[in-house]
């Protein structure tokens, strides 16, 4: 938009806006933040603001919109959630004291990856900013949640791993130092990831050296430096809560591509994108927001270290065995607020009095938790409790300073206890004395004037005043009262005596409020020195919260403690899908065993659609993941290897936004397993080859099975409708056939949902189509085609034919075939809802059907 003729204030605005062209500029004017020109036009649409104009009388009025400064956070969050950046421009001096134009400047650039304000729905969500640097030999990745100060860093060799990490982390913003292709930029933006350029800062900053202190790898150091510089440049303040960066190897954890996590629905449903319906939803019995976030992190990075897994299991077992200890801990955890994010607000300087009191209450609750653990009688719980520092002195300093129920704002007074400061107590005494004097004056003036409804009031414009109703104005003593304001129903007056005491009272109030804020700021700075200890305490309580949740899950859902095999064998007795089992009525889920000895690497699974093949496959993956995060699992017993990777081609939600066909996605995911799986991996393939010609698909599926068998050796569950593939067990020694049982009774298909040895004898595809409600004429045609194919032996693989000629004339003749019109009539009859018809209407329908049959 071309710039209009400007005032000095607008010149100042343009100078600041030029520095942040890609951000909405919230420009402080009095009690409002204003947006101008394109920002106003676009912002008014997104934020549903009234679009008005500045300088309406000029030839070129400037589009303008505004938001109250008290409500600015909600408007900023709305923009940031949609992927925009917001520059906050504040008045840097008191307008009353300014000489000329008020000095203004940017105090913070809020971006999707640096959002501090979190709503109730975000309490269990981490908000990651990720930094990526490219150097010879690979890429460094550092990511941080600014609200908690945590920083993690790793390095990878390949660019594809970078993209996978960004998607798996669900990072909100990536700072990328390098050339990003247009297609990758588009892919990230479609995943709601904002791509930003690195920032620059002059000189060295203490935060950088502090967070890098444990790092030795130059690539990781570069990634962390780029991350911290961006945070400092955007937040424009000290970031004392940033934690020492934790370096990790991706190979330390069970690796799962973003598509695998999505297919398995670990943290959100593939259909709704919400928590409900996910494994996280089932397991999340956590009490604190910190515990919920940690559980999510564990689900995305299951352990490979058997020692660490067993340590977690020990804690879960101890809590499972002691109901009363567990319940006491839960009760105490209810009094623990989000210490990690409270620490961040302390560091940012925007923590309010109530939040500091929440911190103190959390520390008091921590004392009870420690006492419960130490007195439990269990050595593991005792040791855990002894390792927690409750920060007792800090809690006392906060509670001794703040009143029990302080207001939210630290600038309005009424937050510091009596006895904390002698000067503050004197000011308050003066204020109270002044207010008593006002009450005494009001009573005396009523007596002097005879005006019973005379009252003394206050506002910020006139200060203290005497208000007299219109009916009593004649009684006002003109020699002492001076009229200051006339209202519809009353007049307001002042007296010399009232103004004299007003000055004393207001001076005491001003000094009291200023001193309270000073004392609060000192307390906040004292708390800031404890941030590292508070963050460590937050981590300990979060982990305890997850252990308690696992114990509750185990008790309520009858989970077992899994053991681990060094011989690469699986033995799950009566295993259940944790999510499906949770939503079905009690006792209705049919459990299944899964036993694969050391010599068996592939189970080839056949059976009809809807019979439960995919559920059975996912069940194993979810049980393995639960086991490797330290949880107990839904089974009577479970013995598992420690898997290093999980690969899936299940198709819970095909990722087609990149422009790839379903078959291309299928082949890409299959290739991931063939290229990277090891003998310690778990591979789940469902209907590989379905997206191409029949024989192409069958040939590819067979070749993939053979490669997995001969070259990879990973534990593999391979579901297929190509029944010809079941003959592979004759040549592949480590492959076995299993199938999902089904039976036919009176022409109806009944799913047994039970895994049985050997291949399925038929697929029951037409029966499933019938359950789906396909028209009878279609089902009849399909049955005819099936009989022709079976008669011709078309199920034998014939390399000379590329596609079955399904629509050639059908020579098979059925007994008493129905006409098409009769098929349609049967469809109509089957769809009638008798509960919605009157007896008379039913009789008329029957008559119509009889007539139709006679005409045919």
From Swiss-Prot:
Pfam families: MutS_I, MutS_II, MutS_III, MutS_IV, MutS_V. GO terms for cellular component: cytosol. GO terms for molecular function: ATP binding; ATP-dependent DNA damage sensor activity; damaged DNA binding; mismatched DNA binding. GO terms for biological process: mismatch repair. ATP binds at residues 607-614. CDD domains: ABC_MutS1. It comes from the Bacteria. The keyword Transmembrane does not apply. Keywords: ATP-binding, DNA damage, DNA repair, DNA-binding, Nucleotide-binding. This protein is involved in the repair of mismatches in DNA. It is possible that it carries out the mismatch recognition step. This protein has a weak ATPase activity. Belongs to the DNA mismatch repair MutS family. HAMAP family: MutS. This is DNA mismatch repair protein MutS. It comes from Lactobacillus delbrueckii subsp. bulgaricus (strain ATCC 11842 / DSM 20081 / BCRC 10696 / JCM 1002 / NBRC 13953 / NCIMB 11778 / NCTC 12712 / WDCM 00102 / Lb 14). The gene is mutS.
């Amino acid at each position: 938009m071309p710039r209009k003729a400007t005032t000095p204030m607008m010149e100042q605005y343009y100078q600041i806006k030029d520095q942040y062209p890609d951000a909405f500029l919230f420009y402080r004017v009095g009690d409002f933040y204003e947006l101008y020109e394109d920002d106003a036009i676009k912002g008014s649409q997104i934020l549903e603001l009234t679009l008005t104009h500045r300088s309406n009388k000029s030839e070129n009025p400037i589009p303008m919109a505004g938001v109250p400064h008290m409500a600015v956070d909600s408007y900023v969050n709305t923009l940031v959630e949609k992927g925009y950046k917001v520059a906050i421009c504040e008045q840097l001096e008191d307008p009353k004291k300014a000489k000329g134009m008020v000095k203004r400047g940017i105090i913070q650039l809020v971006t999707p990856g640096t959002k501090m304000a979190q709503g109730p729905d975000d309490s269990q969500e981490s908000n990651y900013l990720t930094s990526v640097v490219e150097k010879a030999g690979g890429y460094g990745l550092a990511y941080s949640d600014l609200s908690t100060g945590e920083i993690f860093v790793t390095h990878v060799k390949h660019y594809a791993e970078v993209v996978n990490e960004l998607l798996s982390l669900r990072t909100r913003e990536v700072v990328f130092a390098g050339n990003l292709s247009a297609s990758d930029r588009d892919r990230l933006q479609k995943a709601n990831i904002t791509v930003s350029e690195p920032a620059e800062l002059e000189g060295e900053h203490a935060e950088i050296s502090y967070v890098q202190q444990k790092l030795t790898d130059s690539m990781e150091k570069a990634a962390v430096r780029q991350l911290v510089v961006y945070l400092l440049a955007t937040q424009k303040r000290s970031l004392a809560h940033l934690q020492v960066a934790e370096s990790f190897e991706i190979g330390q954890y069970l690796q799962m591509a973003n598509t695998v996590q999505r297919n398995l629905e670990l943290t959100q449903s593939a259909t709704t994108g919400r928590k409900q319906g996910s494994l996280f939803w089932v397991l999340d019995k956590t009490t604190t927001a910190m515990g919920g976030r940690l559980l999510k992190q564990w689900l995305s990075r299951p352990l490979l270290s058997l020692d660490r897994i067993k340590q977690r299991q020990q804690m879960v077992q101890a809590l499972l065995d002691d109901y009363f200890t567990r319940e006491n801990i839960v009760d105490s955890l209810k009094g623990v607020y989000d210490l990690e994010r409270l620490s961040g607000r302390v560091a940012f300087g925007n923590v309010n009095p109530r939040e500091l009191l929440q911190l103190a209450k959390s520390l008091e609750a921590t004392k009870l938790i420690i006492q419960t653990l130490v007195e439990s009688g269990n050595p593991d719980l005792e040791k855990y409790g002894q390792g927690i520092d409750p920060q007792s002195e800090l809690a006392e300093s906060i509670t001794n300073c703040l009143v029990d129920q302080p207001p939210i704002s630290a600038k309005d007074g009424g937050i510091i206890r009596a006895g904390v400061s002698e000067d503050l107590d004197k000011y308050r005494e003066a204020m109270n004395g002044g207010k008593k004097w006002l009450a005494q004056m009001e009573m005396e003036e009523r007596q002097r004037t005879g005006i019973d409804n005379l009252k003394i009031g206050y506002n910020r414009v006139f200060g203290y005043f005497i208000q007299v109703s219109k009916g009593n104005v004649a009684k006002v003593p003109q020699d002492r009262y001076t009229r200051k304001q006339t209202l519809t129903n009353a007049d307001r007056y002042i007296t010399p005596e009232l103004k004299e005491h007003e000055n004393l009272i207001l001076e005491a109030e001003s000094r009291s409020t200023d001193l309270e804020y000073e004392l609060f700021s000192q307390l906040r700075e004292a708390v800031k020195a404890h941030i590292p200890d508070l963050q460590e305490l937050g981590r300990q309580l979060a982990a305890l919260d997850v252990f308690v949740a696992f114990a509750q899950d185990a008790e309520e859902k009858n989970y077992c403690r899994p053991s681990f095999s060094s011989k690469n064998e699986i033995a799950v007795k009566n295993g259940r899908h944790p999510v499906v089992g949770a939503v079905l009525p009690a006792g209705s889920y049919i459990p299944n065993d899964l036993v694969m000895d050391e010599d068996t690497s592939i189970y080839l699974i056949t059976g009809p659609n809807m019979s439960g093949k995919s559920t059975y496959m996912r069940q194993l993956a979810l049980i393995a993941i639960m086991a490797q995060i330290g949880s107990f699992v839904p089974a009577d017993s479970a013995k598992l290897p420690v898997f290093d990777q999980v690969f899936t081609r299940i198709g819970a939600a095909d990722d087609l936004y990149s422009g790839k066909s379903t078959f291309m996605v299928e082949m890409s995911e299959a290739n991931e397993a063939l290229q990277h799986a090891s003998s310690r991996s778990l591979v789940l393939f469902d209907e590989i080859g379905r997206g191409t010609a029949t024989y192409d698909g069958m040939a590819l599926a067979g070749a993939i099975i053979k490669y997995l068998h001969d070259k990879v050796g990973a534990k593999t569950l391979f579901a297929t409708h190509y029944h010809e593939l079941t003959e592979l067990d004759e040549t592949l020694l480590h492959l076995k056939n299993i199938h999902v049982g089904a039976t036919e009774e009176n022409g109806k298909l009944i799913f047994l949902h039970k895994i049985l040895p050997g291949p399925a004898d038929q697929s029951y595809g037409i029966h499933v189509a019938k359950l789906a409600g396909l028209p009878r004429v279609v089902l009849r045609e399909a049955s005819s085609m099936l009989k022709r194919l079976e008669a011709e032996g078309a199920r034998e693989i014939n390399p000379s034919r590329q596609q079955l000629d399904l629509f050639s004339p059908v020579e098979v003749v059925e007994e008493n075939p129905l006409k098409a019109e009769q098929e349609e009539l049967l469809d109509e009859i089957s769809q009638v809802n008798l509960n919605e018809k009157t007896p008379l209407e039913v009789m008329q329908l029957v008559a119509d059907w009889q007539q139709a049959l006679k005409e045919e």
